[in-house]
A protein has these predicted regions:
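Short beta-strand His + acidic residue motifs that chelate non-heme Fe in jelly-roll/DSBH
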Residues: 72-73, 89, 95-101
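Short, conserved beta-strand element in jelly-roll/cupin
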Residues: 38-41, 55-72, 110-112
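Short acidic-glycine-tyrosine-enriched beta hairpin
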Residues: 76-91
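A short glycine-rich, His/Asp/Glu-containing loop-to-beta-strand
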Residues: 12-53
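Catalytic-core "active-site belt" of small-molecule-metabolizing enzymes
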Residues: 2-16
Length: 126
């Protein structure tokens, strides 16, 4: 049966330094092997703490930029991002994304697994 999942009913992820929701995952009964998260990274100077670098062991991440502008920092280099851009982060590559604009940087993140928590490692710095 088709169903509507909106931002008001989506699971809140509680990631540091960003508003984050998970509208599609195995937890809501989705049988697809994809997890989708919407992330809003506040502008520089916001009171929230930023999320540091992290990596996903055994699976990649695809980031689609909906609005704002920023930089994805990865072990392979810095990638400036803007609306319409897609960034592919290979499995095991340490990365983080920073907002470089004066509006929230809104990202749609795709993972080819229903749960990323077991394969994600957080780091204090690069």
């Amino acid at each position: 049966m088709a169903r509507l999942i909106n931002q008001d009913t989506a699971k809140r992820l509680g990631l540091p330094g960003r508003a984050s929701i998970e509208p599609i995952s195995g937890e809501i009964g989705s049988r697809c092997s994809v997890r989708i998260a919407t992330i809003a990274v506040p502008p520089p100077g916001a009171k929230e703490t930023t999320r540091g670098p992290h990596l996903h062991d055994g699976f990649e991440e695809v980031i689609y930029v909906l609005s704002g502008a920023g930089t994805t920092h990865a072990e392979s280099g810095k990638i400036p991002i803007k609306p319409g851009d897609l960034v592919l982060i290979p499995a095991g590559e340490k990365h983080m994304t920073q907002n470089t604009s004066d509006v929230p940087l809104v990202l749609l993140c795709f993972f080819p697994v229903p749960d990323v928590s077991a394969g994600t490692t957080e780091f204090a710095s690069f």
